């Protein structure tokens, strides 16, 4: 008998298209055309008598978060490295980071010659807990990075208390949380610094890009120097044709600047963010109910969360269901039914094939350092269990309607009902 599952030759549950991503804001074409004809395509281009798009976006993004300072950057990875260095992290220092995240949470720490210390996560929120972080603090700890993962906001009250008790800077990685808030404050504005990614898949995107926000003027100035080869923006307008960047020599940096094209796109895309987030939240709530009826456990968020941002919708499979089926087979079956990618949760960073410091000569800094950055030394049981049982959907699916959410639930029901077929 032929299985009804599409992955086994049956008929797919859905063939209609899903919402596309990215979705350009109405003002994007004109903004890009303006840059194209401006004669200034980067922050280091000649001043043309008006504010750069980079400055305009920095102001808009800072205002959106209620903070005085935003420094745009080339990527989220660049932003994290800039924030860490601006906080004083350097050679041999330890930085506590989540064990369940994209590999950049570890590689950025390596990139500033420091040592990532991977922390296990809370089984419900999938974010680091204050208790787990505090247990890892040593005399070599120099900073803590918290990732607001998928759709959750971490326990910022508890994490802030831990960081303050030990005199450590706390960096929020908000690459997956643009627009989320905690006790009425936007994430990124709750700690020493907040970093963001504007890579293609993010809810605020310019293809690639990033930013660092902060309330600390000195830290913002250090970030400026670090991202522009040791230069910072001038206080006033320069002469026409000159650069707005001043060579102060205060702090050596490198080039991690955002282009004018990207900044122009981001300023326009920011006008859509809240509306799109509202749509995602409403559809996620529908999906929570529908999948909960099937026994799945949607990702939770911390108690202080005011509003969530759904970069990814994550849910744990029902206990006892499909336990003998590889998770990639389950997600493959769901993808075949929906015509939309359903993915396994992130692998724990130390087990991720993309996290391989031993393949880079720049990290061979002596036996002690190499032992400290060896991924094999970390035991992360909750991360490992989560990776075996949690599936995810990209936020584009949440820009649909109630009928789309019903289709997602129907696909899960079908795969759960015929799960035995996946084991053959």
From Swiss-Prot:
- Pfam hit, one: DegT_DnrJ_EryC1
Pathway field: Metabolic intermediate biosynthesis; 2-deoxystreptamine biosynthesis; 2-deoxystreptamine from D-glucose 6-phosphate: step 2/4; Metabolic intermediate biosynthesis; 2-deoxystreptamine biosynthesis; 2-deoxystreptamine from D-glucose 6-phosphate: step 4/4; Antibiotic biosynthesis; neomycin biosynthesis
Task performed by this protein:
Catalyzes the PLP-dependent transamination of 2-deoxy-scyllo-inosose (2-DOI) to form 2-deoxy-scyllo-inosamine (2-DOIA) using L-glutamine as the amino donor. Also catalyzes the transamination of 3-amino-2,3-dideoxy-scyllo-inosose (keto-2-DOIA) into 2-deoxystreptamine (2-DOS).
Q: Which UniProt keywords apply?
A: Aminotransferase, Antibiotic biosynthesis, Pyridoxal phosphate, Transferase
InterPro entries from the entry? DegT/StrS_aminotransferase, PyrdxlP-dep_Trfase, PyrdxlP-dep_Trfase_major, PyrdxlP-dep_Trfase_small
Tell me which CDD domains the record gives. AHBA_syn
Q: Which cysteines are joined by disulfide bonds?
A: none
Statement: the UniProt record of this protein carries the keyword Signal: no
- Which domain of life does this protein belong to? Bacteria
Q: Which reaction does it catalyse?
A: 2-deoxy-L-scyllo-inosose + L-glutamine = 2-deoxy-scyllo-inosamine + 2-oxoglutaramate; 3-amino-2,3-dideoxy-scyllo-inosose + L-glutamine = 2-deoxystreptamine + 2-oxoglutaramate
User: What is this protein's gene name?
Assistant: neoB
Q: Know the name of this protein?
A: L-glutamine:2-deoxy-scyllo-inosose aminotransferase
The molecular function GO annotations come to: pyridoxal phosphate binding; transaminase activity
Q: Give the family, as the similarity comment puts it.
A: Belongs to the DegT/DnrJ/EryC1 family. L-glutamine:2-deoxy-scyllo-inosose/scyllo-inosose aminotransferase subfamily.
List of residues that carry N6-(pyridoxal phosphate)lysine: 202
